[in-house]
């Protein structure tokens, strides 16, 4: 099993690489790539951790050596948010970075599962899909926008509010991965109920949690450590599914039946070929139904921006 992390020298990439080095199955290969010259050193640093995960680092313009033979590619390359920016302000820089890296994936490991972390995810996933399509290698079951951070934040905030253990809570989060497009389905958590005001406040906090971190870091960065953890959780779920484990379910931003939008975050069953099944989002509360309808314009525009960028 070979996993490649692109953007491995950044805050998210290093946290993700550390978690993968300690948690990937024995005998796995972990390949780190970043344009930054420090990347081979990050790999050497991590290689001193005593786990049976083989690690190599590559830097420079060419990601090909890192991508050769990869089963899973996780992309965290790009610039981070600063105070006053929202995820869409990142588009101008990150769109080009994602296009370039996905072109290299299309040439080098076209059958790999691809997980996109680089923001704005609503748009960068659409860019990746169009690049793969142009190259004639697009498989909609193998491209994922990683929205797991919304899930783990939801689990944490609900547990805090209700005095529960966070590991016992799993909140499905649908829609997209920015602002109003993030919709936690709080009505679907077994055995937990909320007042109307709690739902409004929690939903808003989950939607704005990224900004909470950006502001708390006072210009020194965005959510890197929690995002690294979220990406590792999703990446390890992909590994387990590829190894034939059954019933691996995660929420992710994927191309589906287009009922709400071409790309939509929803619970998915993972299998040996990526998405095995897109699960129904279930019954929504009136609040959730309204929130879903309200987000679709924004989501459609985000997706179109990505499609137009490649065309």
Curated annotation (Swiss-Prot):
Listed PROSITE patterns: MDH
EC nos: 1.1.1.37
Any GO BP annotation: tricarboxylic acid cycle
CDD domains hit by this protein: MDH_glyoxysomal_mitochondrial
Protein origin, superkingdom: Bacteria
GO molecular function, one term: L-malate dehydrogenase (NAD+) activity
Subunit composition and interactions: Homodimer.
This protein's name: Malate dehydrogenase
Organism this protein belongs to: Yersinia enterocolitica serotype O:8 / biotype 1B (strain NCTC 13174 / 8081)
């Amino acid at each position: 099993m070979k996993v490649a992390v692109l953007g491995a020298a950044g805050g998210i990439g290093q946290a993700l690489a550390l978690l993968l080095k300690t948690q990937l199955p024995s005998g796995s290969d972990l390949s780190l790539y970043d344009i930054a010259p420090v990347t081979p050193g990050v790999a050497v640093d991590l290689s001193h951790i005593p786990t049976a995960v083989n690690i190599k680092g590559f830097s420079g313009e060419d990601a090909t050596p890192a991508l050769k033979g990869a089963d899973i590619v996780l992309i965290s390359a790009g610039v981070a948010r600063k105070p006053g920016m929202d995820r869409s302000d990142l588009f101008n820089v990150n769109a080009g970075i994602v296009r370039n890296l996905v072109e290299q994936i299309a040439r080098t490991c076209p059958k790999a599962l691809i997980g996109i972390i680089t923001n704005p995810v609503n748009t960068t996933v659409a860019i990746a899909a169009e690049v793969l399509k142009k190259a004639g290698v697009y498989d909609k079951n193998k491209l994922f926008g990683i929205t797991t951070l919304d899930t783990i934040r939801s689990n944490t905030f609900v547990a805090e509010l209700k005095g529960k253990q966070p590991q016992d809570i799993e909140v499905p989060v649908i829609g997209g991965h920015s602002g109003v497009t993030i919709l936690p389905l709080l009505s679907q958590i077994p055995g937990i109920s909320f007042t109307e005001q709690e739902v409004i406040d929690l939903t808003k906090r989950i939607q704005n949690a990224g900004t909470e971190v950006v502001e708390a870091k006072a210009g020194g960065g965005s959510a890197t450590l929690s995002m690294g953890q979220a990406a590792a959780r999703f990446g390890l779920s992909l590994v387990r599914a590829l190894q034939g484990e059954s019933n691996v379910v995660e929420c992710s931003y994927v191309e589906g039946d287009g009922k709400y939008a071409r790309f939509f975050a929803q619970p998915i069953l993972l299998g040996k070929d990526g998405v095995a099944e897109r699960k129904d989002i279930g019954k929504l509360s009136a609040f959730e139904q309204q929130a879903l309808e309200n987000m679709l314009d924004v989501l459609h525009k985000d997706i179109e921006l990505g499609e137009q960028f490649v065309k």
